[in-house]
């Protein structure tokens, strides 16, 4: 009898575990395509806190970069071009496109000058001025820049590391066709 009870407990526990393992990962936060984007809330150049979630409803490119990063600065014209082209577009899951720029700078003046020189005209710029030890980089597991995540209006990651024409192509795929 004890063996039968033990066996039933094992079977029931296994069924319970399997049932929950196969449930869809709805609202799972992470950094992979299909995950809900992890919240970021850090200081803007004027010292206010800006949360990624404040942009909900828009398609957002979370763009990790720095003023001292040559490849980042070379990519900035592509990001600016995409911003200008898509900022007022309607998407399947979002209205408008913007950039949430996350700087890995340590020097605020260098960060501000790069924003101005590169014409990064969107208003969502954040940094904790922690460089490679910055909290946003740790949260997203950033170990090289430039790197980015594209999220839809519901905060779901729909693309990653989209540079050059790949960003336009990804935005074209999720734009609402007229």
Locations of regions flagged by a protein language model:
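Extracytoplasmic/secreted envelope proteins and their assembly/folding machinery
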Residues: 76, 80-83, 108, 112, ...
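Conserved redox-active cysteine motifs that mediate thiol-disulfide chemistry
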Residues: 56-57, 64-85
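Intrinsically disordered, low-complexity Ser/Thr- and acidic-rich flexible linkers and loops
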Residues: 89-95
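Alpha/beta-hydrolase fold active-site loops
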Residues: 59-60, 97, 146
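Short, internal strand/loop/helix patches
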Residues: 43, 100, 105-107, 112-149, ...
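N-terminal "domain-start" segment that seeds a small globular fold
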Residues: 22-53, 176-177
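Bacterial Sec-dependent N-terminal signal peptides
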Residues: 1-28, 178
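Thiol-/selenol-based redox modules, centered on thioredoxin-like
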Residues: 144-178
